[in-house]
Regions:
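Accessory N-terminal region flanking or inserted into the helicase ATPase core
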Residues: 1-7, 16, 33, 106-192, ...
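P-loop NTPase Walker
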Residues: 1-83
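Short beta->alpha junction loops/turns
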Residues: 10, 40, 180, 196-197
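Catalytic P-loop NTPase motifs of RecA-like helicase/translocase cores
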Residues: 12, 73, 193-202
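Hydrophobic, Leu/Ile/Phe/Ala-enriched alpha-helical segments that form helix-helix packing faces
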Residues: 24, 51, 55, 97, ...
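Conserved phosphoryl-transfer catalytic core
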Residues: 84-111
């Protein structure tokens, strides 16, 4: 059964979700079988802290599934931060492909999988991946602002894939896909998703 709680900011949606968590606990559902997932690490932490203020006998270890989906995948896959593509890796790819990249990184502090870059090539490639369409399909949607060369776009995507394969690295989208492929999903009886409208298709 699936329910949606809809409302503008500040109307108590998170409080409502936490009240529902408490109802399941009162009915006998174990906390390690309840998942509460938020779009950002900050939002997940705030929800966890608010719940712990109510349930003072509990600790963070008791509600380990209050997190982002990327944190869940990262932990279940046993990854380390050095396994994940970083800003420097994308800059090196840019040097190989002849494009200047000042910054290109995921918001690792939030672990929400949001990718930002000053290169519209990289942004377009990442957008296509989270939408689960090809980069050329995304290009043909004409949602980009700058001029994008079709052949260069294809070459950059191939270089990213080759680079990751050569150095054994993954990005945040790979992380979710690998998690799904390995099917190492914790046995949860109920799942809450805060700000579900912000999730990508693959999430």
């Amino acid at each position: 059964m699936r329910y949606k709680v809809v409302g503008p900011p500040g109307t108590g949606k998170t409080r409502r979700l936490l009240n529902e968590v408490q109802k399941y606990v009162d009915q006998g559902t174990q906390l390690n079988r309840i998942g509460y997932f938020a779009f950002t690490r900050k939002a997940a932490g705030e929800a966890r802290d608010r719940f712990l203020k109510i349930k003072t006998e509990l600790t963070k270890k008791d509600i380990k599934y209050f997190q982002t989906l990327h944190s869940l995948a990262f932990n279940r896959l046993g990854l380390k931060e050095e396994n994940v593509m970083q800003d420097l890796n994308y800059k090196r790819i840019g040097e190989t492909c002849g494009i200047q990249i000042k910054y290109a990184s995921y918001e690792t502090n939030n672990w929400n999988g949001i990718f930002s870059s000053d290169s519209e090539y990289l942004s377009l490639i990442n957008l296509a991946r989270v939408k689960q369409i090809s980069v050329l399909e995304q290009l043909d949607l004409n949602e980009h602002l700058s001029k994008i060369e079709r052949d260069k776009l294809d070459a950059i995507e191939k270089e990213i894939n080759n680079y990751k394969k050569t150095y054994g690295l993954i990005d945040f989208t790979d992380m979710i896909q690998k998690f799904l492929d390995e099917n190492d999903i914790p046995p949860l009886d109920v799942i809450f998703v805060d700000e579900a409208q912000d999730l990508s298709l693959i999430q």
